[in-house]
C-alpha cells in the first residue's frame, strides 16, 4: 500500500522577501532546492514558525547562491520578512521503499548548517 510521507524539508529558513502582486508560489534559492531534493514547481506545505500560519503552494527557483526565500501572491499576506519557515515536500511511497526524508537545517543567513538523511 502506498502512503504519503515526508520526502524533504527545509527547516527554519528565513523569509527574505514577499510580493503580494506576484502570481503565487514560494521562490527558493535553486541551490537549496537541489540540496533538499525539492523540484521547481513542486507542491509544498509551508509553516510559519513566527505566527503558526500554514499554506500550500508550489516552488519556483530563485538565483543560485542568493539564499532567497520569497513568498508570493496571496500567501504573502501570511508571512513577514524575517519570519522563520519550514518548507515540506511529500511523496508517495511503499513502506519498504521509504528511507526517510532529507532535511536541511538552516541558520539565520539561510545557509545550510546540517543535512540529515532518514530522520
Swiss-Prot record:
<dbReference type="Pfam" id="PF02261">
    <property type="entry name" value="Asp_decarbox"/>
</dbReference>
<feature type="binding site">
    <location>
        <position position="57"/>
    </location>
    <ligand>
        <name>substrate</name>
    </ligand>
</feature>
<feature type="modified residue" description="Pyruvic acid (Ser)">
    <location>
        <position position="25"/>
    </location>
</feature>
<keyword id="KW-0210">Decarboxylase</keyword>
<feature type="binding site">
    <location>
        <begin position="73"/>
        <end position="75"/>
    </location>
    <ligand>
        <name>substrate</name>
    </ligand>
</feature>
<keyword id="KW-0670">Pyruvate</keyword>
<feature type="active site" description="Schiff-base intermediate with substrate; via pyruvic acid">
    <location>
        <position position="25"/>
    </location>
</feature>
<keyword id="KW-0566">Pantothenate biosynthesis</keyword>
<dbReference type="InterPro" id="IPR009010">
    <property type="entry name" value="Asp_de-COase-like_dom_sf"/>
</dbReference>
<dbReference type="GO" id="GO:0004068">
    <property type="term" value="F:aspartate 1-decarboxylase activity"/>
</dbReference>
<protein>
    <recommendedName>
        <fullName>Aspartate 1-decarboxylase</fullName>
        <ecNumber>4.1.1.11</ecNumber>
    </recommendedName>
</protein>
<comment type="similarity">
    <text>Belongs to the PanD family.</text>
</comment>
<keyword id="KW-0704">Schiff base</keyword>
<dbReference type="GO" id="GO:0006523">
    <property type="term" value="P:alanine biosynthetic process"/>
</dbReference>
<keyword id="KW-0865">Zymogen</keyword>
<dbReference type="GO" id="GO:0015940">
    <property type="term" value="P:pantothenate biosynthetic process"/>
</dbReference>
<keyword id="KW-0068">Autocatalytic cleavage</keyword>
<dbReference type="InterPro" id="IPR003190">
    <property type="entry name" value="Asp_decarbox"/>
</dbReference>
<keyword id="KW-0963">Cytoplasm</keyword>
<feature type="active site" description="Proton donor">
    <location>
        <position position="58"/>
    </location>
</feature>
<comment type="function">
    <text>Catalyzes the pyruvoyl-dependent decarboxylation of aspartate to produce beta-alanine.</text>
</comment>
<keyword id="KW-0456">Lyase</keyword>
<comment type="subunit">
    <text>Heterooctamer of four alpha and four beta subunits.</text>
</comment>
<dbReference type="GO" id="GO:0005829">
    <property type="term" value="C:cytosol"/>
</dbReference>
<comment type="pathway">
    <text>Cofactor biosynthesis; (R)-pantothenate biosynthesis; beta-alanine from L-aspartate: step 1/1.</text>
</comment>
Amino acid at each position: 500500500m502506498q502512503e504519503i510521507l515526508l520526502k524533504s524539508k527545509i527547516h527554519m529558513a528565513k523569509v527574505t522577501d514577499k510580493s503580494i502582486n506576484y502570481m503565487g508560489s514560494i521562490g527558493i534559492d535553486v541551490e537549496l532546492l537541489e540540496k533538499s531534493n525539492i523540484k521547481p514547481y513542486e507542491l509544498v506545505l509551508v509553516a510559519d514558525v513566527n505566527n503558526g500560519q500554514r499554506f500550500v503552494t508550489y516552488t519556483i527557483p530563485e538565483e543560485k547562491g542568493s539564499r532567497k526565500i520569497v513568498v508570493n501572491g496571496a500567501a504573502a499576506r501570511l508571512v513577514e520578512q524575517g519570519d522563520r519557515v519550514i518548507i515540506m515536500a511529500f511523496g508517495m511511497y511503499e513502506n519498504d521503499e521509504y528511507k526517510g526524508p532529507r532535511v536541511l537545517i538552516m541558520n539565520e543567513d539561510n545557509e545550510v548548517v546540517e543535512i540529515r538523511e532518514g530522520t
